[in-house]
Amino acid sequence: MATEVVDVLVTGGKATAGPPLGPAVGPLGINIMNVVKEINEKTKDYAGMSVPVKVIVNTDDRSFEIEVGIPPTSALIKTELGLDKGSTEPKAIVAGNLSMEQAVKIAKMKKDSMLSFTLKNATKEVIGTCVSTGINVEGMSPRDAQKAIDAGEFDEYFNE
């Protein structure tokens, strides 16, 4: 069984037969519209976000399987806050304020794809992404929020 794997980044629920999907999958001899339909069905919950998708094609019988990844942390943060984009000057301009509850929620979504062993450390990873997007956490800079987590100020969020 020979397989080909195509990795693409698509907008949730809005994949089309055009680039980047069409040119990558078309030469493999499978019905592109069936692929698009299945991708859109599986990514509809991530509407508007960039979602990593793997199309695994069995070149012998031309069957395919779709694996949907989790959107990048920055996309989840921006969606949670209702932002179109982060700050253009992260150190000078604040684009939004993430609550600790929202940070923990995103960490739980991403935990399986992160290197952290604990929810507390996964949340600190999410907050680290806030540094580059210009988003504060609980009204403080992301670095200060990470220090506050280390000091135990938000331990009530990590009791599982």
Curated annotation (Swiss-Prot):
Keywords: Ribonucleoprotein, Ribosomal protein, RNA-binding, rRNA-binding
Organism of origin: Methanococcus aeolicus (strain ATCC BAA-1280 / DSM 17508 / OCM 812 / Nankai-3)
Single GO cellular component term: large ribosomal subunit
Subunit-level organization: Part of the ribosomal stalk of the 50S ribosomal subunit. Interacts with L10 and the large rRNA to form the base of the stalk. L10 forms an elongated spine to which L12 dimers bind in a sequential fashion forming a multimeric L10(L12)X complex.
Any one biological process term the GO annotation gives: translation
Record bears the keyword Transferase: no
Role, per record: Forms part of the ribosomal stalk which helps the ribosome interact with GTP-bound translation factors.
Disulfide topology: none
Family classification: Belongs to the universal ribosomal protein uL11 family.
Xref: NCBIfam families: PRK01143.1 (NF002232)
Molecular-function annotations in GO: large ribosomal subunit rRNA binding; structural constituent of ribosome
KW Ribonucleoprotein (keyword) present: yes
InterPro entries according to UniProt: Ribosomal_uL11 (IPR000911), Ribosomal_uL11_C (IPR020783), Ribosomal_uL11_C_sf (IPR036769), Ribosomal_uL11_N (IPR020784), Ribosomal_uL11_N_sf (IPR036796)
Protein name: Large ribosomal subunit protein uL11
UniProt xrefs under Pfam families: Ribosomal_L11, Ribosomal_L11_N
